[in-house]
Design a protein with these regions (language model features):
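Domain-level recognition of nuclease-like catalytic cores that cleave nucleotide substrates
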Residues: 135-195
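Short secondary-structure junctions
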Residues: 75-83
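Catalytic cores of nucleic-acid endonucleases
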Residues: 103-156
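Interdomain/boundary linker segments immediately adjacent to catalytic/signaling cores
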Residues: 1-76
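Hydrophobic, Leu/Ile/Phe/Ala-enriched alpha-helical segments that form helix-helix packing faces
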Residues: 68-76, 123-130, 168
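Conserved catalytic cores of phosphodiester-cleaving nucleases, focusing on short active-site segments
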Residues: 92-105
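Beta-rich catalytic cores
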Residues: 88
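Residue-level marker for well-ordered alpha-helical positions
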Residues: 66, 70, 120, 159-162
Length: 195
């Protein structure tokens, strides 16, 4: 999938698209860590800091927001950083969505991804306040973990969990894996379903 998406992104001439041109970033989005010399947290962290030219410890959120912004530029109209809504500062806004980006590395242990479903509760009033659907965009390890816990479609999404996801959607809150958004970007001639 990563190689086909990279071929597609090479056809885009928009100068605002830069992070998605990095083939290793695209591999990382899809969970392909073959570009790391060793599959260790320290190597993933060093790579992420290098991509952002950011020596500070925290990098995945910033990289995820950059990826999310570029994908939104390709998918939606009028992408911008939204004004603060009451006490909330969401990551992105388009003509139809308020977007909160959730990103996680692949080689970090812990329970951070288990908190992603709570984002829907935290921002439950955003659709009413803005008239726009809240889209919670799960990127990289956050997407993988959201599939494993049943928040996104996959074998772990039981009937009961699907009911919760449906309830969120009925209330203008949707969880979306970045890989699904990337599929929507590509021409049908680049069908990725067989990869």
């Amino acid at each position: 999938m990563a190689s086909r998406f990279s071929v597609f992104i090479d056809t885009i001439v928009d100068p605002r698209i830069s992070v998605l041109r990095d083939r290793n970033v695209v591999k990382w989005i899809y969970g392909d860590l073959s570009f790391l010399t060793t599959r260790k947290k320290e190597h993933e962290d060093a790579w992420g800091r290098k991509v952002l030219n950011r020596p500070a410890k925290q990098w995945s959120g910033q990289l995820g927001e950059a990826i999310g912004k570029e994908v939104c530029i390709l998918l939606y109209d009028n992408v911008k950083i939204p004004e603060r809504i009451q006490r909330f500062q969401l990551d992105l806004e388009t003509d139809t969505y308020m977007i909160e980006v959730k990103t996680q590395t692949y080689l970090t242990s812990g329970t951070a991804a288990e908190k992603i479903p709570a984002v829907s509760f935290k921002y439950a009033d955003v659709p009413r306040l803005t008239g726009k659907t809240l889209q919670i965009m799960c990127i990289a390890g956050a997407e993988e973990q959201s599939k494993k816990c049943g928040l996104l479609p996959g074998p772990a999404q039981t009937f009961q969990k699907q009911n919760y996801v449906t309830f969120f959607k009925e209330n203008q809150v949707e969880f979306v894996g970045l890989s699904n958004l990337l599929k929507a970007l590509q021409p049908s001639s680049l069908d990725l379903s067989n990869e």
